[in-house]
Amino acid sequence: MKYKINYSPEFLNDLFQIGDYIEIQLHNPAAADRITSGIMDSTDILVEYPETGAKIFLPGGLDSGYRFVTFEDYLAIYQIRFNEVYIARAVNVRQDYMRVLFPWLQIRSDHDE
């Protein structure tokens, strides 16, 4: 069975922001194109193998329903919804992706100390 890929507006905005930062702030348009294309390409496997990505667990070990695939220092975070893979967000591995996904959760991180 092949799954349909659906990109959220937030994911597309994240991708734009990542590319914009690399191109403008880091003055590297070639890297911006390579990184944003690589993040998109990392989701291609999900059409046939949506369970490829690692699961994201909430504190206490509860499955959040999200998974992620990686490209270099970036995560493409997604959910499997019946016959669809919903690509929710793209984040740098240095970001607190739990707070990006669950801003309402009181999650204590090492940065809070």
Q: What label would you give each PLM region?
A:
Residues 19, 26, 47-54, 98:
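Short amphipathic alpha-helical interaction/hinge segments
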Residues 8, 12-14, 42, 53, ...:
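A broad, structure-centric signal for solvent-exposed, well-ordered loop/edge residues
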Residues 21, 42-45:
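Solvent-exposed, amphipathic alpha-helical segments
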Residues 6, 27, 31-37, 54-63, ...:
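Solvent-exposed interaction patches of small proteins and small membrane subunits
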Residues 45-85:
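Basic/aromatic recognition patch in beta-strand/loop cores that engages polyanionic ligands
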Residues 1-38:
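Arg/Lys-rich, positively charged N-terminal/basic patches that mediate binding to nucleic acids
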Residues 71-75, 79-113:
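Enriched for short, Lys/Arg-rich terminal
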